[in-house]
């Protein structure tokens, strides 16, 4: 939320010298413990602890900065990156292997062989699909995957399936993997099939000794349980049981491919799992242990080589796109501003972790640019900007014309023009895909985004603490999920007619749930830092206001329960078979939620990018896979 004061238009420690006014700037590096009246008619509650570095200029007015760490990925480093995997020979080798694997899969579909029989054909087919998807190469095998899943579904019944079409009894591993895979592809399958695997006490049964096969079955049960819909108690029971079981297994089994997979799945689950990160991890475990291989050794070897080649071929494209993005940032006003978070590389990494299609460069770069713009505006409205400046910027944005900059302070002029040019450029790109004007969609989203920030600024200026419901309604917009989603998905090259777009964009249930989840989860990790900067309102503080006597721990527990409930509702909105929008049309919107949610797994990954997110950049963008 924005700080309310009048400050000169620039500060030496926050803005490049070309933006500094002619008046002398006197830096003061100390902590301001309290702050009373800032300007006539505007106050900030003196009891709020102000724990930031303030800059005092010659008129004694202060401007806040949040002391975020600087850009971790310098342009000189990005421009120095190189890779040989863009050469034609690698592409040709990958294409050849893909063709050979398709032939093997199609031959399996026609008739049983020596290794695939009527007693194991269902689990073998499901395992092939699962391996292909987890290796990140499924875009090459869409038809083959559909053929396999149609075959498996033809044998699905109210008790699930056995290992093969002629199996006498159903099997937990086959049923759990089938439930997960079929549900993710839109087949109407009920979780009731899991009830039969409980004992007379209503508990999932397991043997006294954990065998490798049983551990693998429980792992697939855990993976299936994460794709739960509202009201599916058996899925909740399955998640609780399998989580405990797998954590115990990690304590007893030696370090191996299976233990690494268990650790990864427990860590990332589904909602914080990113496809490219999963592929990088699965490449390391696939093929190194018989439990992961396909019945055809040649297929296993070919799939592994395809996965490595695809990872590195896309790596070469990532470098080209990242160099473009880094130049865009360096040549813009952003590189001259030191007060905001510079996270363009991190945002690009998230986009490239959820979409590796070579044709979708506009999506990846657009997501990175739009998200970076949103973050810069977040820091302007939250800390650096004064109320007068914010009102001017809000009015200028709604006018949407370059001439509107003449009323803005210098540092805002550059930001405004970058926003104006980037949004218009993306709209022109989206117009080609959609066959209609899309700029109005974008402008409406940005206006709502900025209005939500102005509301928060007014709350802090008056010392007003809203109700939990009022705060959340506004916070769902100010998180910025809509601006980060709308324009990028419209550039994908896939038409989004109105009846499809209304299932994805505001005010659809999918959009509402995604925004709620991200705002709630985000506040859990940011409220303490924001409170130290004088930003009073958060889901936690508003809940405590509505529930006198409650503690921060009570609030966090309540909010986590809300998030878990909303995630199940989101699963349903994404995967429901009766939706007007196919899963493929909703996938990017859903995956963008997963990308943002990934950053809040352990901390505020937007503000503190030195830890997990830095490793994500290195693992999925900077470093290739050894062939």
UniProtKB/Swiss-Prot annotation:
Cofactor note: Binds 3 Mg(2+) or Mn(2+) ions per subunit.
Broad class of where this protein is predominantly found: plastid
Residues annotated as binding Mg(2+) 3: 530
Cofactors that this protein relies on: Mg(2+); Mn(2+)
This protein's UniProt keywords: Chloroplast, Lyase, Magnesium, Metal-binding, Plastid, Transit peptide
GO cellular component annotations of the record: chloroplast
Signal peptide: none
An example Gene Ontology biological process: monoterpenoid biosynthetic process
EC number of the protein: 4.2.3.26
Domain of life assignment: Eukaryota
Record remark on domains: The Asp-Asp-Xaa-Xaa-Asp/Glu (DDXXD/E) motif is important for the catalytic activity, presumably through binding to Mg(2+).
Function according to Swiss-Prot or TrEMBL: Terpene synthase (TPS) involved in the biosynthesis of monoterpene natural products included in conifer oleoresin secretions and volatile emissions; these compounds contribute to biotic and abiotic stress defense against herbivores and pathogens. Catalyzes the conversion of (2E)-geranyl diphosphate (GPP) to (R)-linalool.
Protein name per the record: (R)-linalool synthase 1, chloroplastic
Gene: TPS-Lin-1
């Amino acid at each position: 939320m924005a700080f309310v004061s009048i400050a000169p238009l620039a500060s030496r420690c926050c803005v490049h010298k070309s933006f500094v006014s002619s008046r002398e700037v006197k830096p003061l590096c100390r902590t301001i413990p309290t702050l009373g009246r800032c300007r006539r008619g505007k106050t900030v509650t003196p009891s709020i602890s102000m724990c930031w570095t303030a800059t005092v200029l010659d008129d004694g007015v202060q401007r806040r900065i949040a002391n975020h760490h600087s850009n971790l990925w310098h342009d000189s480093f990005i421009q120095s990156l190189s890779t040989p995997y863009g050469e034609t020979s690698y592409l040709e080798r990958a294409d050849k292997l893909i063709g050979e694997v398709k032939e093997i899969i199609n031959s399996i579909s026609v008739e049983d062989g020596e290794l695939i029989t009527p007693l194991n054909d269902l689990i073998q087919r499901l395992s092939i699909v699962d391996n292909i998807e987890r290796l990140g190469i499924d875009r090459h095998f869409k038809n083959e995957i559909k053929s396999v899943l149609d075959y498996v579904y033809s044998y699905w019944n109210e008790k699930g399936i056995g290992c093969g079409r002629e199996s006498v009894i159903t099997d937990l591993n086959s049923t759990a993997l089938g439930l997960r895979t079929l549900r993710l592809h839109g087949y109407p399958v009920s979780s009731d099939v899991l009830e039969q695997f409980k004992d007379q006490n209503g508990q999932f049964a397991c043997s006294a000794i954990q065998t490798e096969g049983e551990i693998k079955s429980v792992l697939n049960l855990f993976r299936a349980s994460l794709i739960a819909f509202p009201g599916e108690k058996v899925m909740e029971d399955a998640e609780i049981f399998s989580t405990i079981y797998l954590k115990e297994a990690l304590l007893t089994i030696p370090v191996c491919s299976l233990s690494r997979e268990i650790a990864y799945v427990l860590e990332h689950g589904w909602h914080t799992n990113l496809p490219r990160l999963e592929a990088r991890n699965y490449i390391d475990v696939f093929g190194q242990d018989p439990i992961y291989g396909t019945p055809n050794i040649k297929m296993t070897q070919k799939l592994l080589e395809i996965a490595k080649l695809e990872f590195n071929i896309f790596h070469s494209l990532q470098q080209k796109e990242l160099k473009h993005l880094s130049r865009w940032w360096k040549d813009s006003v952003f590189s001259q501003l030191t007060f905001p978070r510079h996270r363009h590389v991190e945002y690009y990494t998230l986009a490239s972790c959820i979409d590796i299609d070579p044709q979708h460069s506009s999506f990846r770069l657009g997501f990175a640019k739009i998200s970076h713009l949103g973050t810069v505006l977040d820091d302007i409205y939250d800390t650096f900007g004064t109320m007068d400046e914010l009102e001017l910027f809000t009015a200028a944005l709604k006018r949407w014309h370059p001439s509107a900059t003449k009323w803005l302070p210098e540092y805002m002029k550059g930001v405004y023009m970058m926003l104006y040019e980037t949004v218009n450029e993306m709209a022109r790109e989206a117009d080609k895909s959609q066959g209609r004007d899309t700029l109005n969609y974008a402008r409406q989203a940005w206006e709502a985004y900025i209005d939500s920030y102005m509301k928060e600024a007014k709350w802090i200026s008056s010392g007003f603490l809203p109700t939990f419901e009022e705060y959340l309604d506004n916070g769902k917009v100010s998180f910025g999920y809509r601006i980060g989603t709308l324009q990028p998905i419209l550039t994908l090259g896939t038409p989004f007619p109105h009846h499809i777009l209304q299932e994805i964009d505001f005010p659809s249930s999918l959009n509402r749930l995604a925004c709620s989840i991200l705002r709630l989860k985000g506040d859990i990790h940011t409220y303490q830092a924001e409170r130290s900067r004088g930003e009073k309102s958060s889901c936690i503080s508003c809940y405590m206001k509505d529930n006198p006597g409650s503690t921060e721990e009570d609030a966090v527990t309540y909010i986590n329960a809300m998030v878990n409930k909303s995630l199940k509702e989101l699963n349903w909105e994404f995967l429901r078979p009766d939706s007007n929008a196919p899963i493929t049309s909703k996938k990017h919107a859903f995956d963008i939620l997963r990308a943002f949610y990934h950053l809040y797994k352990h901390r505020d990954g937007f503000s503190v990018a030195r830890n997990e997110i830095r490793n994500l950049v290195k693992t999925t963008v900077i470093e290739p896979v050894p062939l």
